[in-house]
């Protein structure tokens, strides 16, 4: 496989991201349509379904930051405590063309970091004490650039909306399955093609949507890696940081399944198969970053 540029990696991941979001949206529509058709709710039912989707998304969008920070148990560092951290975040924010995000530290020995914020104006970068103790400045720059890329690319907003959509698909699909099995109308619909199709949608849509949510999370990690490499012009910094984090891994105590996709590496115990993982394999991320570095060196020699 030939080395690829930052721009090629970013564009490829953008395309994959929007394909995934489109397919999740189609699955949500299919589940809503199956419910409306099965219960013969008509136009009113469709309106109620879409209003529910809108309000749940809006609530998640407005409150996600506060909920995440509250559950993570973070604190604001002082300038005297970590002066280099504040300098790195400020410098990379200027380079990325976004307002300097708020910085928080989590007193946890596990080396990890995450970003949150609905948009660049409300961006937040959180790093663990373990990360600050482990990495040198160039490696820390790679990690911070990765998190700033998440903020610049509106990844938290995207992940929140996707998570809510998938959650709705799972809830609605489960409700439809229960109704199919226990409704008084079941006898009348056993041989009905619409009833069978609705049941198939109720079973498959939640499973497929969950897989797509994980795939979306992995694509955004690849994209943030590529953006970080472009921002620092030094892919090896992030590659080396990921290598160290992998070798010194331990679970983050305050992490949970809700916040896990936000971290630079999976903060929870145990690994999962690629299809069900929120993060790409670290080895693959390191390999891609070093391939970008090789391509950059070749372009420098040619130019």
From Swiss-Prot:
Subcellular location: Cell inner membrane
Binding-site residues, Zn(2+): 146, 150, 221
GO BP field: proteolysis
Cofactor: Zn(2+)
Annotated GO CC locations: plasma membrane
Membrane topology according to the record: Multi-pass membrane protein
CDD domains: M48B_Htpx_like (cd07340)
Top-level enzyme category: hydrolase
Keyword Cell inner membrane belongs to the record: yes
Pfam families, per the entry: Peptidase_M48
Swiss-Prot/TrEMBL keywords: Cell inner membrane, Cell membrane, Hydrolase, Membrane, Metal-binding, Metalloprotease, Protease, Transmembrane, Transmembrane helix, Zinc
EC number of this enzyme: 3.4.24.-
Molecular-function GO term, any one: zinc ion binding
Main location as per UniProt: membrane
Co-factor: note: Binds 1 zinc ion per subunit.
Active-site residues per Swiss-Prot or TrEMBL entry: 147
HAMAP family, alphabetized: Pept_M48_protease_HtpX
UniProt-listed PANTHER family: PROTEASE HTPX
Entry's family note: Belongs to the peptidase M48B family.
Protein name: Protease HtpX homolog
Species annotation: Dictyoglomus thermophilum (strain ATCC 35947 / DSM 3960 / H-6-12)
């Amino acid at each position: 496989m030939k080395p690829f540029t930052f721009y090629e990696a970013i564009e490829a991941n953008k395309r994959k991201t929007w394909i995934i979001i489109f397919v999740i949206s189609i699955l949500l529509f299919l589940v809503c349509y199956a419910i409306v058709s099965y219960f013969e709710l008509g136009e009113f039912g469709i309106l109620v379904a879409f209003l529910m989707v809108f309000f749940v998304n809006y609530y998640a969008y407005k409150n996600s930051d506060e909920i995440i920070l509250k559950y993570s148990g973070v604190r604001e560092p002082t300038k005297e405590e970590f002066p280099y951290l504040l300098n790195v975040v400020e410098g990379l924010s200027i380079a990325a063309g976004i307002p300097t995000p708020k910085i928080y530290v989590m007193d946890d020995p596990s080396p990890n970091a995450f970003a949150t914020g609905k948009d660049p104006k409300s961006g937040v970068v959180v790093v663990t004490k373990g990360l600050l103790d482990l990495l040198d400045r160039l490696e820390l720059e790679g990690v911070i650039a990765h998190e700033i890329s998440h903020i610049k690319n509106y990844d938290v907003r995207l992940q929140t909306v996707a998570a809510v959509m998938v959650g709705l698909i799972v809830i609605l699909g489960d409700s439809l399955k229960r109704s199919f099995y226990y409704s008084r109308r079941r006898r009348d619909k056993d041989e009905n093609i619409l009833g069978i199709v609705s049941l198939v949608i109720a079973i498959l849509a939640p499973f497929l949507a969950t897989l797509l949510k994980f795939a979306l999370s992995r694509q955004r990690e690849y994209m943030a890696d590529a953006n970080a490499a472009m921002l620092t012009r030094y892919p090896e910094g992030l590659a080396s940081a990921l290598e160290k984090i992998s070798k010194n891994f331990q679970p983050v105590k305050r992490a949970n399944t809700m916040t896990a996709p936000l971290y630079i590496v999976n903060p929870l115990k145990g690994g999962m198969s690629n299809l069900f993982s929120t993060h790409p394999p670290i080895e693959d991320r390191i390999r891609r970053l070093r391939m970008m570095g090789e391509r950059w060196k070749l372009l420098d020699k040619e130019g």
